[in-house]
Amino acid sequence: MRIIVFFDLPTITLEDKRDYRDFRKFLIKKGFLMMQESVYCKLVLNQTVASSVLSSIRKHKPKSGLVQMIMVTEKQFAKMEYLCGEKRSNVVDSDDRLVIL
C-alpha cells in the first residue's frame, strides 16, 4: 500500500513559511519521498501501519492551507501513467524486508 499526501500551503508570512518547512520536514522524517513539488509518497506494509501514519499526519497538520491524503494499493500505484517527464529512481523504495545495495 502507498499513502500519497498532496498539500498546498500558503507562504505569505514568515509564520506560513515556517509551517510549510515544518510540515515538509515532518513528512520526510516519517519516511515520505517527494514525487513532485508538494506531493509525497510513503510505502506501508499493512493497514495497521497505514492507520498509524494517517493519524500522525492528522495530528501534525498545518494551521492553514490544503492537505489531502489518499491510500492506494501497490497494483494501482504501479499502473501510474507518466504523461511527461521521466520516472526518477535514484531512491531505493522497496517493500522487501532486505535490500542489498
Curated annotation (Swiss-Prot):
EC number in record: 3.1.-.-
Record-linked Pfam families: CRISPR_Cas2
Keyword Methyltransferase: no
GO biological process: defense response to virus; maintenance of CRISPR repeat elements
HAMAP family: Cas2 (MF_01471)
Family that this chain belongs to: Belongs to the CRISPR-associated endoribonuclease Cas2 protein family.
Protein name as catalogued: CRISPR-associated endoribonuclease Cas2
Gene source species: Filifactor alocis (strain ATCC 35896 / CCUG 47790 / D40 B5)
Name of the gene this protein is made from: cas2
